[in-house]
C-alpha cells in the first residue's frame, strides 16, 4: 500500500473510489479520462462562483484552472464545479436585491451538497462578489474538510476626467443627476469609464471587506486577497493554493482548527481597522455559527470599539484596494495591528503557520499613507460602530469611517419599503434634519434584508449625506456613506420597535456612546405594540418564502439552520 493509498483510507472519497463495490463509480471516472492513479488520489473540489452577471466573478473560471494545476502538481485530483451567486451591483435598487442575502445560504448549501454528494476530500473555493465570499467560507467550516479560500480580486479604478472613480461614484451620480448637478451627457460618460476591468467593487465595500477577513481569519494565503482581478499574479496565488491544500490534507489541518474565537476577533479587528462594510457584522456571526461558536453582533461591536481605524480606504477615505495591495497589502495592515496588540498572533492559518509567523518578515513601508501605523491611527476607534437602545434592543450597526459628526437627533420620517423612500428622495419630498426610517426590509420582513445603496447614494449625490440620517432593519452596501444605521433589531416584521415608530417621533443617535433611542416611554411603546399586527407578504412560495420561514435575526448573522453546536457528525469524519 503506497502513501497516497494509505491517506485515501481516511478520506471521504474512499466511499466512491475504493473496493469492488465501487466499480460502477470508477467507470464514470474512466469515462472522463481519469487514470487509475488519479482515481486513487485525494479528490479536491474546486468550487467557483463564476457567472456572467457582472465583472465581479468573470475572472473566476480562469483562476480555477490555475488552482487545478496546483492540485494536480501536488498529487491530487481536482474536480471543478460552479455554484450560483447574486451580484449586488446588478440586484441593487429593485426587487432582485431580496435574493442577495439568501444567496449566501444557497451558496453554502449548494457547495455542501456537491461536496457531500461526490465525497470530495478537500475544497478550494473561489468567490468574487459580496455574499459569495462569506457563503464559501461558511461552506468550508461547515464541511470541515481541508480548505483554502481564494478571492477573485478587485476591479481596477476608473478614470473620469482625471479623477479616480468607482461604482460608488456611479450611484452617487444618479443623485447628482436628479437635482440637475450632472447632465445626461456627463452621466453617460462616467458610466462608460467607472468600471474598466474584471473584478469586484474596488473600494472597501463588502467584497473587499470579506476578502480582508479571509486573510485575517486564516483561510486565505497571505497577500492573495489584495491583488486585483486582472493581475496575472492571481494565477500564481491560485496555483499555490492548489498545492497548499494538498499539504493541509497531509497535515489534517481543517477549517475549524483555523476559525477559532481568536481568529474571529482578528477578522473583526481588520474590518474595523480598514473602515470595512457593516455587512461583516452579519457574516462573521454566520461563519462562527457554522463552527458552533457564539459570536454575535455585540461581540463584533466590542472588537470594533477597541480597534483603531488605520486604512484610508474608500468609501470613507481616499484609496482603493489596488492601492493598498501595491504598498504592502493586507499583511501590512495586519502587521501594524499585531505589533500594537490588536491581533492574536498565535492563530493557525492555511499556511500551516501562525499569523505571527506569517507576518514575521513583513516590513513597515514608510513611503505610503494608505495604511497608517496603529499607534498613529486616523481615529482611535474603528470605522464601524455597534449601537443599542430602546429602538434597537438586539443592536444595530453604522459605518463612521470618514464621518466628522457622530451624533444626530431628528424627527422620524417612516417608509415601509425602500422604493417609497427612494421616490421621496428623488422628488425631494423629505426635509433636512429628518431621520428617514425604512422598515419591513429585515431578513423575514423583506424578505431578504435588502441593501439601501440606491437611496443613500442618491442622498449623498444631492449633498444631503451629512444633513439627514437613515435607519433600517435592512442592510447597507459597503459603498454607503453618511449617517446610515442598519440591521436594527428586532425587525419590524416581528414587532420590533422600529415597526412601532410614527412620523415625527424624535430619534437620538449617538455613535460615540453606541446608542440608538427613540424619545418614547416604555409604556408608550408597549401601548403601540398592542395595536401592531403582522403584515402580509407577497412572497408566499419559492426560495424567498423558504428563507423567510427559516431565517433568524440579524444579531446572530441571519442564519437558517441550527449550526455547528448542534452537529452530531461532521462531514469530514464520515
Curated annotation (Swiss-Prot):
EC number: 4.2.1.9
InterPro entries cross-referenced by the UniProt entry: DHAD_IlvD/Edd, Dihydro-acid_dehy_C, DihydroxyA_deHydtase, DiOHA_6PGluconate_deHydtase_CS, ILV_EDD_C, ILV_EDD_N, IlvD/EDD_N
This protein's pathway: Amino-acid biosynthesis; L-isoleucine biosynthesis; L-isoleucine from 2-oxobutanoate: step 3/4; Amino-acid biosynthesis; L-valine biosynthesis; L-valine from pyruvate: step 3/4
Key words, A-Z: 2Fe-2S, Amino-acid biosynthesis, Branched-chain amino acid biosynthesis, Iron, Iron-sulfur, Lyase, Magnesium, Metal-binding
Residues bound to Mg(2+): 88, 130-131, 451
EC primary class: lyase
PROSITE patterns for the chain: ILVD_EDD_1, ILVD_EDD_2
Pfam families associated with the record: ILV_EDD_C (PF24877), ILVD_EDD_N (PF00920)
Catalytic function, reaction form: (2R)-2,3-dihydroxy-3-methylbutanoate = 3-methyl-2-oxobutanoate + H2O; (2R,3R)-2,3-dihydroxy-3-methylpentanoate = (S)-3-methyl-2-oxopentanoate + H2O
In-chain residues carrying the UniProt-annotated modification N6-carboxylysine: 131
GO BP: branched-chain amino acid biosynthetic process; isoleucine biosynthetic process; L-valine biosynthetic process
Superkingdom to which the source organism belongs: Bacteria
Cofactor (UniProt): [2Fe-2S] cluster; Mg(2+)
Amino acids binding [2Fe-2S] cluster: 56, 129, 201
Cofactor note: Binds 1 [2Fe-2S] cluster per subunit. This cluster acts as a Lewis acid cofactor.
Active-site residues annotated for this sequence: 477
Chain residue ranges for the region called Disordered: 1-20
GO molecular function term, any single one: 2 iron, 2 sulfur cluster binding
Biological role: Functions in the biosynthesis of branched-chain amino acids. Catalyzes the dehydration of (2R,3R)-2,3-dihydroxy-3-methylpentanoate (2,3-dihydroxy-3-methylvalerate) into 2-oxo-3-methylpentanoate (2-oxo-3-methylvalerate) and of (2R)-2,3-dihydroxy-3-methylbutanoate (2,3-dihydroxyisovalerate) into 2-oxo-3-methylbutanoate (2-oxoisovalerate), the penultimate precursor to L-isoleucine and L-valine, respectively.
HAMAP family according to UniProt: IlvD
Quaternary structure, from the entry: Homodimer.
Family under the similarity heading: Belongs to the IlvD/Edd family.
Protein name: Dihydroxy-acid dehydratase 2
Species name: Bradyrhizobium diazoefficiens (strain JCM 10833 / BCRC 13528 / IAM 13628 / NBRC 14792 / USDA 110)
